[in-house]
Amino acid sequence: LESQELMVRASWLYHVEGLTQAQIGERMNLTRRRINELLAAALEQGVVRISFSSPLAENVELEARLCSRFGLHDTVVAPAPADPAHMHAVIGRASASFLDRLIQVRKPRSIGVGWGATLHETVRQMTGANEPAMRVRSLMGGLTRGSEINTFEIVRSFAKVLNAKCHYFAAPIYAGSEEAHAVITAQPVFQEFLRDGSNVEVSFLSVGDVTGHSLQVRYGLPPQTDIGELVALGAVGDLLGRYLDAEGNPVDHPLNRQVISPELDAYRGIPSRILASGGPHKHAILLATLRAGLATAIVTDSESARMLLGASDASR
């Protein structure tokens, strides 16, 4: 299925959008020779005739429209699973394929990652590489209890599958108070880590919502946090532990002054900012991050892609 997805995507960009093979290679993180092979195979196998014969072509069209609408460099749209319980696995598989190609072609020197089930599924399905000079960093603090979806386990797993250097961020997601946050982040070691996190070449994160589906809501928030207060202030979800409104702006809540992660302005300085999330409960926060220009690439499902485009059309 992955090979057919690559074949259809390359063929669409070449035959419909008129990109050169070199441009397609850069867009898809593949060599020009590989693009040539995919285009030839598409013709030989009948994928490309007068029109596309694969149902995956609709996803490629959605990708092109999302890139155009939101100014994205890359988009991957995976078929929406029939069972929502499989969403993390579907987005994870698509993200793994995307990251494998990006790392193989672009050879980034540093990658920053977050936490969660989508990232866990991604690293579990990656082919892997041998990049001993690469640095993998956690971009935010982690849960205080062990878990395979925790920031610490995620960054360790990415470093292992890439044979890269691992840089932990030994801090909680949230300080206990605004005063404690000021004390923690005033320490030179934390200032250096936040600065280094903002200087990675690629970031790979998922977004969180404000429903019971959210692992952040269930496990990551400080005790006694009232998620209803965040919702009342207009929060639709979080990125890097920072709760945002529908336009992608941080809401005025103490939690956003307690989170230990890069400021959004610093995060925007990362050249390649990949967000991977899908499912109806993520629609509002995905749209918010795109409106605010917080991503350069997204990996999502086809139903979410249609929602993002429809919501954008409605606001015009």
Predicted feature locations:
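Conserved phosphate- and dinucleotide-binding cores of soluble alpha/beta proteins
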Residues: L1-S11, H15-N29, R34-A40, G46-F52, ...
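Structural beta-sheet core signal
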Residues: V113, V136-S138, Y168, L275
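Glycine-rich beta-strand-to-loop/alpha-helix junction loops that act as flexible
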Residues: I111-T118, G278
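HTH-adjacent hinge/linker in prokaryotic transcriptional regulators
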Residues: A40-G112, V123-A133, G142-E148
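Short alpha-helical
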Residues: A57, A117, E121, H281-A284
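Short Gly/Thr/Asp-enriched flexible loops that form oxyanion-binding sites at enzyme active sites
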Residues: T118-A129, L215-T225
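Short, well-ordered alpha-helical scaffold segments within catalytic/effector domains
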Residues: M7, A85-A96, H120, F190, ...
